[in-house]
Every structure is written in C-alpha cells, then in structure tokens.
A protein has these predicted regions:
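Conserved core of the sugar-phosphate nucleotidyltransferase
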Residues: 113-189
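N-terminal amphipathic alpha-helix/helix-capping segment at the start of soluble metabolic enzymes
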Residues: 376-417
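N-terminal glycine-rich phosphate-binding loop and ensuing alpha1 helix
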Residues: 1-54, 58
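Conserved alpha/beta core of the MobA/IspD/sugar-nucleotide pyrophosphorylase nucleotidyltransferase superfamily
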Residues: 1-3, 163-239, 362
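Alpha-helix-loop-beta-strand connector modules within alpha/beta enzyme cores
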Residues: 441-468, 505
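Nucleotidyltransferase catalytic core that binds NTPs
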Residues: 235-379
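Hydrophobic faces of well-ordered beta-strands that scaffold small-molecule active sites
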Residues: 270, 397-403, 425-429, 466-470, ...
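Conserved beta-loop-beta/alpha segment of the NTase-like Rossmann-fold superfamily
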Residues: 62, 66-141, 145
Length: 505
C-alpha cells in the first residue's frame, strides 16, 4: 500500500503563516508539524512508500522530509502549474507512479487521530472518512451516503449528506477507475475543479464505503482559526489516559510495539498484575510484582505504572477512569471473554473506549513462553513455589492426579468466576488413588519406586507444585531418603499419617 499526500497548493487563507513556508509545515504542537504527524503515523502503521505532490516552495518540503530521518521511501511529483490548477491536476502529474496500487489518499493540511487512520487502513474495502455527529459545514466537503456507500462528494450537497474530509483508503480497482476519470478530465482541460468532481461521475462503477469517525479528530487546517481549534483538540488527545494491563515476565518486541501504538492514543498507564492475580489464572510469575513494575517504568513513553490486584479491570477502571483501554483481540473468545464484556460495560457508563489490537502470534513469542513454562517445571522452581503460594494466598486449592493425563487436567482447568478466573494451585498425588490406578487394594502394596514413576509422568507435562500423599511414610529409617528423593524430583510437600491396618480400596 502507498500513501499519496497532496501538498502543491499555497494555503493563502492561512495569511502570514504560509508566506514563507508551505502549509503542511505549519506547527501544530511543540514537537510536530502537519506533515511530520502524517508521516510518523504512516510509518508506525507500516506504510513506507509515500508520494508527495509539491508546487509552492517545493524544496522546503523536500528538505524538511530529509531532516525527519524516517525509514520511508518518498517520491516527489511537482505541479509546476500549482497557481492555476487544483489538486486534480497534481494527481494527473503523478498518474504514472500512483496507478495500479492500493493507496491512502489525503490532503496535506489534514490533521487526524491515529485511530482514524488505523481503522481505515484495516478495512478491507475502499472507504472515505465522514462524520455522522459533526455539523454540516457550509463551504467544505460533504458526502452523500446511501446504504453505507459514498455516492456524491462536494461542497453543495446537503440532502442525505454528512460532513466529510478528503481522507481515503482506496483499493487498486476502485482507485484505477477514479484515476482514469481524473486523467480524462485533465486531458479535456478540466484542471481547476476538485478531483471529487471526477469521482461523482463514476461512483456507480466503484464501491467506496463511508467510514464514520464520529467525534474523532479529522479536520483540515484552512485558517488560523482552524489551527487554534486543532491545537486545543490535539492537547486534549495527547493528555487522554490510555490504560493497558500486563502479566508478562519478559518484555519482547511485540509488547513494545503495542505500547508504541497505544502511545499514539494518549498518555499510557500500565497496570501490572499482582503475583496473586497471575497465579490465579496463569502460571506462577517468574519475577515478583516489584521487579515487573520497575521493568515497565523504564519503558520510554510509559506515563505511569500501577498495580492491578485482580484479573478483572473493574477496580482500576473505576479508580482511574481511563479514556481508552487497550488490549489484544485474543480475549474476544475463550476464558477472558467475560472480563472483556465487563470492561465494555464499565467504559460505556462514562463514554470510555476499548481499542483492540491484533494479537501477535509470532513463533518466537510462543517459543519464549514455552521456555518460561519449561523453567517453571524444573525441580528447584517447582519445589519452592508451594511455599510462595501459601505466603501469597494463605490458602491453596489442589486436585488429585495419578497419571500424566489427570495431571494435565489439574494443570489446564480454568473457570470464570465473578469477573476473574480460577484454577487449581497444586497437584495432590493421593496414595489411595495411586494404588487404585495400579489395581492394588492398599498403597503399602505399591513399591515407592513405582510411585516415583507416577510423579515423573506428571512432572513431564505439568508445572504446578506437587503435594505427595506418603501414607505412613514407610519405615522410619527409610523416610529421610524418601524425602530427599522427592525433593530432587521437585515435590513441594509430603503428608504422612499414623494408621493401623490396611486401608482397603
């Protein structure tokens, strides 16, 4: 996909601001101009091929783009007749390098939110930005929309029309149809009208859907008054609170990428799940909360890091009232589906928004998680974890297992409960069930070596702490050796009892 930015005009309505520079170089904040904002967003969203049409003070645009040092492939097409033509002619000048491609088409004076551009890029079909909530302008673009399809675009349409901006995502087929009509207009001398005049002739031949940005920022800077309004809106956007939550022990490139995307939406607050919250639904954390918190505090652009004590977002959303909550789209299905629903309902109460980014199913991330899980299964890690859980939760839940398969049931079983997720904390290896599985009426008839094989089978496929039912413990003289063997295998606890006679199954 390629982006086409129209920057040939003078922007004379801006007065002294554009007397010495093109309008696209107008500063809209301390750190960015209109053009730098557009290019940075395109770069963040993976669009590296850019075509910029120039005209008025063209060299200033070229020199400025070089100072940005962005990893972009920018081509410049100059419209020498910029003073006597409209942007339809600039597109005609660029026709040979912009045809036969999917494109993002925008005017060079457009300022928009990151989420507006992102949403349009992610759509499968061609689309144009409209707003069903904005007031119809008197002199600017409006789009006539029928059944979600743009039928007419211009300044004189009012019936069945919505406020519109010249920001398009166009698939190759639709764009080629429009570009062909643009070329026909220019060949016939129609070079002072809008390119949308040509579009209006062929809307029955292409399908351009309306993308409703509603109240999100997407506006042209035509006057100094427009500039003042947009600066205020950008200040509000940059100070919006964006909330994310993490449970990871290791930060990889996928986490950094999603944080950087979230930073485009406002100030990022990271919620770090407490050790207890993670242990309640996932593997036990390798790093304690305090270290994971510091880890996120040292990521550039993270505004604040707070603790999230439960898997449910309810308490933190109600406390901090973020404007936007960001999460991967993997929770739309599965065990966290109910938590997602709760987040949506709470945000609706005060007008908050949920933004979901595509989850990264990269093989290297999956391999990293498997490596961490394997470390948890190591005897030293497994053995010490029961004590940590008891210190953390005071009470743990265990379920009996007597084979690799039943061990997997204990390991994987999770249930949603009141906005959270519950799972078993430990595996109980029962002497009664172990002997029954081996067809023996009493555990005293089962050799300890045989029981050790059961533990090996379970350890091979699980990571949770193991509590071993040692029955009587056998001979007192042998018990110390039994305990040492169990410790080497990673067993966290052995329970013995005093009994007389056989306990028949």
């Amino acid at each position: 996909m390629e982006a086409v930015i129209l920057n040939s005009g003078k922007g004379s309505r801006m007065g002294n601001i554009t007397s010495m520079q093109p309008k696209c170089l107008t500063k809209i904040s301390d750190k960015e101009t209109i053009l730098s904002r557009q290019l940075n967003m395109l770069c963040e969203l993976g669009i590296k091929d850019i075509v910029i049409t120039t005209g008025y003070l063209k060299q200033k645009i070229i020199d400025y783009c070089e100072t940005l040092k962005l990893p972009l492939n920018i081509k410049y097409v100059n419209n020498n007749d910029y003073e006597s033509t409209n942007y339809i002619y600039s597109l005609y000048c660029a026709r040979d390098i912009i045809k036969d491609k999917d494109i993002i088409l925008m005017h060079g004076d457009l300022v928009f939110e990151y989420s507006v551009l992102e949403d349009m890029i992610l759509r499968d079909k061609s689309c144009m930005k409209i707003s069903t909530t904005s007031k119809l302008p008197d002199k600017d673009f409006k789009a006539v929309v029928e059944g979600g399809i743009v039928k007419k675009v211009g300044i004189n349409y009012f019936d069945k029309a919505y406020e519109a901006q010249p920001l398009y995502k166009l698939n190759k087929t639709d764009w080629n149809i429009w570009l062909k009509r643009i070329c026909e207009y220019c060949v016939n001398g129609k070079i002072t009208c809008y390119a949308e005049n040509a579009l209006n002739d062929i809307t029955d031949l292409c399908q351009i859907e309306s993308y409703d940005a509603k109240n999100k920022l997407c506006a042209e800077v035509d006057t100094e008054e427009d500039l003042s309004i947009i600066k205020e809106q950008l200040y509000e956007i940059n100070n919006r609170l964006v909330y994310m939550c993490f449970s990871t022990d290791v930060i990889h490139s996928g986490h950094i990428a999603i944080i950087k995307r979230a930073q485009q939406l406002g100030k990022v607050m990271v919620g770090v799940l407490s050790d207890e919250a993670i242990a309640s639904y996932k593997r036990f954390p390798l790093l304690p909360f305090s270290e994971r918190k510091v880890m996120f505090e040292n990521i550039k652009g993270v505004y604040k890091v707070v603790e999230q004590n439960t898997l449910s977002y309810k308490n933190n959303i109600e406390k901090y009232r973020p404007d936007i909550v960001v999460h991967g789209d993997d929770w739309r299905n599965g065990i966290q589906k109910g938590i997602r629903k709760e987040v949506i309902n709470i945000l609706k109460e005060y007008g908050g928004e949920l933004r979901e980014f595509p989850y990264s199913y990269d093989k290297k991330y999956i391999a990293t998680e498997r490596k961490l899980t394997a470390e948890l299964a190591m005897p030293d890690m497994r053995r010490s974890r029961l004590r940590k859980l008891l210190n953390l939760k005071r009470m743990v839940t265990a379920l009996e297992a007597h084979s690799g398969l039943t061990g997997l049931i204990v390991e994987k079983t999770m249930v949603e409960d009141e906005g959270g997720i519950r799972q078993f904390d430990a595996i109980w290896i029962s002497s009664l069930c172990d002997s029954t599985a081996k067809g023996k009426p009493d555990i005293e008839l089962v050799d300890m070596t045989s029981r050790f094989r059961t533990i090996d089978d379970i350890c091979e496929v699980t990571t949770k702490p193991i509590i071993f039912d040692g029955d009587t413990g056998g001979l007192v003289e042998h018990f110390i050796y039994t305990v040492r063997s169990l410790e080497r295998m990673g067993v966290s606890m052995i329970i013995i009892e005093d009994k007389k006679g056989l306990k028949k199954n």
